[in-house]
Amino acid sequence: MDTSVMAPTRRNLLLHIAGWALTASDAVAAVRPEPSDRPLAGAIRWDAWYMPGSEPTAAVERSLSPPQYQSRLPFFARRDAEDHVSLPALSPKLMDLEIEQAAYAGLDFWAFVGYPADSPMTVALRQYLASSMRLQIRFCMFTQIETWGTSRAPAPLIDEHIALMKDEAYIRVADGRPLYFLGFITAAKANEKWGGTSGLRAAIERFRACAVAANAGNPYIVLAGSPKEIAGLAPMLGGDAVGAYVISDVRGIGDYPELVRIAEAGWQTLADADMPVVPTVMTGWDRRPRVEHPVPWERQQRPGSGIEYYFGAPRPEELSAHLRRALAWIQSQPADRRAPATLIYAWNENDEGGWLVPTVPCDTRRLEALHATLARGQQGQQPNCTVAP
């Protein structure tokens, strides 16, 4: 990574956070969420797409360059006369357009994957926070447990996220609590980083107490991991609900209905925690681009190894039916185990096979399928893919 870029971007984000802390009202913790007759619906944002020349952007350009995968490219990707793929820098107008697209779909929030402030993976979050349109779709954070640091050295990112919770666009559940995902939790990581589950529980309790003391509110914390493992760990960790970033089978093969069967069985496994479950809705799972061209952060992947394991893509009506079942499943739970939201994998995990963002040249069918479920009867301009000048 280019360290000459990192320092100013971290400084800028910290200045933004300081500004929010100074201008936030003391009553921010009591902000009422917008009323709804259904659980909230959000989508994960994994933003490797927006910083040309960075390691993550170069990696996804490479993974989606083969002709058989180019149909997955997000709508803003460029292809030259020789079919070379490039991804442009994120502009304010491009972010505004994505906000409009997500709002049309009826999404309530994006769950930004949390990274240190100097990472190129935070470019989209910074651009979103600078947008005057951001209240059209709110946001929260989905944080990997690794980025929280350790018991001896908690990461600065923890305080940064508490400050973000005070932004007026941060999503809050029905009782006004800011929604927060802490993910990829395993017993091994708890032992390595936090001295065991008791140490991680103490860190979660400190996070909660610091958020309350900062007047950000009492976070509604969703503990996420593989369904079977997190269902066993979560009751010991002091969260409010359980969930998963993705629910699939790394050695699975089949059509989209088979992936849906696995995902929905995963909801039931998560329910073994005897806690509310935020069900994950899968838009797909097909990692073949990364199998053919491994990305730097997946060091164990060998080119071609496991190429046969993938699931077919959904038809729009199959995707919307899966989402409707997730919303109905939440409502079917006992009142004390009814989660406030469902989480969609994903807005833009295109090279892993999970996306909602329009793809080249302007395929908006997945957004239209969501609109029919989440925003039925609401007026809205059809999504387009033209970035304003």
Residue ranges with predicted function:
Residues 1-3, 11, 25, 349:
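Intrinsic-disorder/low-complexity regions
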Residues 3-20:
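N-terminal secretory signal peptides and thylakoid transit peptides that target proteins
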Residues 7, 24-36:
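C-terminal segment of N-terminal export signals and the immediately downstream linker at the start
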Residues 16-17, 25, 67, 76:
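Low-complexity, intrinsically disordered/propeptide-like segments
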Residues 22-25, 359:
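Alpha-helical transmembrane segments and their juxtamembrane interfaces
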Residues 31-389:
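Glycan-processing catalytic domains of CAZymes
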